[in-house]
Structure formats: structure tokens, C-alpha cells
């Protein structure tokens, strides 16, 4: 099995786009890329825009040759109705989606999911609602958790976690569980016993606003439990990489992993690259170059459509 992170915060954008290849299947998870509309009360910097444009091209190119596309929920850094990533990527693909009607918040149920489904209408070879189901595709098993909360607050909606297995190993893609602040977030991982997990990490950059201290502490404890679950590799990237001090936040997880011989890494480091932290350094970027960014029309429309 081969795992290739395509776009993540440690690669310079908001995304969790990941390519997973088994012996007989190529699966693309959450093919979307976005930026923070505002951070430190600043719009995206030109370096962020350029990086998004670069990775969008990579993502579209990767999508041409995949068999399966998975959409874990309907936030714009996980799905795209055509703002940045053209919906033609879904042509002739088997597409697994989060249930657009059940266990979903109102903004996704009544606006984002319907718009997305209209945008890809008649393009996939088949669309399957995936929540809580298991599918055999060739010699590959793709399992989905029941919908679990998007972090500690159900008002942000629900996501489905994904386990992809071949005869050799299993990888879990947690989607946006925000570092597992609820015990229900752990159930799927304990059932599937993966060798590799891709997890987003807590919203520590919003501590004191959206995230409570006790929720952060619970997320870290639960991530420690995940590391103890027989894993070989943990890729922690997405929400927590929006915090410039992410390594300090994750130190207890790193320490336990080191004791157990588990590799913990960002998506960039997994690819043997230095993390390219842009959003968390936006103030610094504007101090270096204060010119307003040139936004492509699609990206401008995406950013005006709202965060998440």
C-alpha cells in the first residue's frame, strides 16, 4: 500500500487530500483545497495563493488516474463544487460520499451537499452513500464509520472516517475529528487496528474561542490512546498545523510515540519535505511583502462562500 499526501497545511494550504494506492485500486480522499479567508484579520497572502494554484494542478492531475473518490463531508477544504477543482475529476469514478440527508448540520444539508451533488450530476459511474458501510472493490476493502461529530461541537456537523485495507495493511483517514475530543472518535480506529492513521489534530489555534482547554486536553489524551493502538505511522496534519506552535501542542503525543517506536510526522515530513507553514505565518508573510494577493476568480468565489 502506498500513501501520498497531496495537499495539507504542512504543504501550505487548507486540505487533507490524500492518494491511497493498493495493489489493484487508486483511491483519492477529499479532493479539495482552500485557504483561510481571514487570519490575524488578514486576507490570504500571494504565497498562499500561488501554493494553492500549484497544488490544485497536482490534485487535478492525480485525479485523472484514480478509480475511487471519497468525500468525507461538505466543508470546502474537503469537497469542491467547482470553485478551484473542476468537477470533471469525478467523471467515470466510483464516488463514496457522506450521507447528505442524515447526521448532517443545516448548512451542509440544505446548501453545500445539494450544490455539490448538482455539480457532479451524471459524471460519476456510481455514487454510494457510505456512512457505516463496507465495500469490496477488487481485492481492496473500503470501510466507513458511522457519522461522528466534527470535533467536540456537533453544530459543525458530522464526518465519516475511512479505512482502506488490502491483504498487507490498513490505513485510516479520520477526516475532521479535531484530534478526537470524544470517545466515539476512537471506536473506528480500535475496531480496524490500522498500521497507519491520518488524523487532523485539535483546533489549538482557536483555544479560548472555539476550543476549551478541557477539550484540548481530552484530544491529546485520546490521540495518545490512538498511538498505543498498534500503529506504525501517525500522520498528524490539518487543523493543528494552523497553530505555529503545533509541535509544542503535540509534544505529549510525540513523547509516547517515541517510547513505543511509532513514527509521528506531518504530511510534509512523511514526503521527506520540510513543512511549509504559510497560514500560521500570514502576519510574517505580509511583513515581508505587503502587496495584496491576486485571487483567481474561482478562489475569490470560494473564499466569499465562507469558511469550512
Curated annotation (Swiss-Prot):
InterPro entries in the record: Metallo-B-lactamas, RibonucZ/Hydroxyglut_hydro, UPF0173_UPF0282_UlaG_hydrolase, UPF0282_hydrls
Domain of life: Archaea
Pfam families: Lactamase_B_2
Leader sequence residues: none
NCBIfam families tied to this protein: PRK04286.1-1 (NF003287)
Cross-referenced PANTHER family: UPF0173 METAL-DEPENDENT HYDROLASE MJ1163-RELATED, UPF0282 PROTEIN MJ1629
Family: Belongs to the UPF0282 family.
Protein name as annotated: UPF0282 protein M1425_2116
Organism of provenance: Saccharolobus islandicus (strain M.14.25 / Kamchatka #1) (Sulfolobus islandicus)
